[in-house]
Amino acid sequence: METKYLKINTADNVAVAIVALPAGEKLIVDGKEIILNEDIPAGHKFALKDFTEGENVIKYGYPIGHTRTVKKQGDWINENNIQTNLAGLLEYTYNPAEVDLNIPHKDLTFKGYRRKNGDVGVRNEIWIVPTVGCVNGIVNQLAEGLRRETEGKGVDAIMAFPHNYGCSQLGDDHENTKKILRDMVLHPNAGAVLVVGLGCENNQPDIFREFLGDYDSDRVKFMVTQKVGDEYEEGMKLLRELYAKASKDERVDVPLSELRVGLKCGGSDGFSGITANPLLGMFSDFLIAQGGTSVLTEVPEMFGAETILMNRCRNKELFEETVKLINDFKEYFLSHGEPVGENPSPGNKAGGISTLEDKALGCTQKCGKSYVDGVLPYGERLKVKGLNLLSAPGNDLVAATALASCGCHMVLFTTGRGTPFGTYVPTMKISTNSALAKNKPGWIDFNAGVILENEPMEKTCERFIDYIIRVASGEFVNNEKKGYKEIAIFKTGVTL
């Protein structure tokens, strides 16, 4: 029998249409007949009771906003008749939650690259990283030259990562650029890196070299284009040296405890919090139980669900760091005259997400139910295993770049609307619905929509774990197959 709706939590006063439902449809919800007063698109909400004006709408067991007007049982609840409860800064109280997941440990491994410093990569690529946007054309030309010369053999990829920054920046923007580029150069998915500078930029190559700290000088080379005659010939000479090293690297067995994944969603819809995001949450809990690491970001998309994360902080210090994480981003919004609750995009709303709380309560499903063990500022690298929260905005390119830069080997990206992009680590797309997976097989890597078709979440997660291990061991995801790899750096200040 086809499932037509889902009431997510027993406390909810709305349900979600699994399929498009016509006006006049009769449904039995908790033993009570509900007659729909209007057409309800798939992924959208309908009222299970009569609402007075200003009454809270409950989904996932929490308020997602309040009604703007009186609504009747069977009415369509959407962004036109529900309003966010979010306002400015809040004071929070630590009410620690008990976490007892009881997930068995399995001795699972993947095939990765063990680096000289003991770290592990899931890819062995050669990267060309510009210190400043002025040399973007050069790094692109060098990457193409090495690909042509080697026919792309011997390493997983040869990529240049152009960006707009590295000069005409001050303060935090300049530091953010340096941090993200440093994190790239030191990332274990790179078997070798050529750093290309101009020579007169704010992000001075010599200072940036010191900023890197310890690095393998056999695997990281520098070229300052103003100091060489023919930058292409000099760059190719250095790349040949790097290729000779990287192309000899081989995969070895690595325990799953060394895997680090970023958790991301974009182009979300009303099914995100029902299928793909809970699937990631189940996987995240499993990975952490094996000793691994997952990272949740998109701080503005935590607004409205932040107390769930705060109360899962392992101690008071982490709770206070999480409060700062949330309120710093709220202050960033307010300092620019922007309301903290204006997040859902047109695509989100078309897909059934009405308010930021609606989005946040679905978004935070991605990190499961584990304790929070770490909180990271933007641009900083992981220090502890387990579940970490990372400061970065919701923008897909900026957030995914930040996840890669903190040390994640891959980004697990759920989507209900679809997106082709990838950051500089494998960016796996998990669809919330089967229609998207069928329509965009060149974008979607794994379909969580089968959960709506009565496949048990546990079975889907077993298949997902197997797929993650295959990808960590070298199987390419779609963004890699197509060469869709790019970076975006968070900018908050002026440009000179």
Regions found by a protein language model. Give the residues of each.
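Metallocofactor- and cofactor-centric catalytic cores in central/energy metabolism, strongly enriched
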Residues: 1-410, 417-420, 425-496
